[in-house]
Amino acid sequence: MKYESGRSMVEMIGVLAIMGVITAGAILLINVGLNSSKRRSVDDEVTMLVTGIRDSFSGYDDFSGIGNVNVFTMTGVSQQNPYGGTYGVAVDPSNPRQFIVSINGLSQSECEALKVRTWPGSIGYEMSGHKESGATGTCTNPNGENVVQITFGE
């Protein structure tokens, strides 16, 4: 009987398959972590924007002057969001006592995730008794072209 030393090809293929599964799992976990981090960043930045705008306009009857002020310089928040798009801030055309924060340049999945997230202090969230997100958005456009809008104010 002849004894062989080393590994057979089947054993090596098995080891490579196991390594492939481990690598794919690690990549998936890293991706989930990055997405979670981006969502937290958006949450923090929108909160800073809203707080800064409310503080700056607290002495006024409405937010109609928001178009004349660079809110990003005023609040210290970058206009670019973590997804490569931009934030936008504008007075609600139907009610100058409200303003709209838009998050532009989202993929479809990120758009859906941010649209259903609860946005405390937003108009839709307050009026629904804290049962709905308070955000609206169109999430059917190609990736990078979706927008979520959140209305704040009275």
Range-by-range predicted roles:
Residues 55-154:
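Periplasmic/extracellular, small/polar-rich flexible segments of pilin-like filament-forming proteins
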Residues 1-34:
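N-terminal single-pass transmembrane signal-anchor helix
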Residues 13-20, 39-40, 77-83:
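Short, functional N-terminal and low-complexity linear motifs
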Residues 3, 21, 40, 102-105:
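Short N-terminal micro-motifs specific to bacterial/archaeal maturation
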Residues 28-65:
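Membrane-proximal N-terminal amphipathic helix
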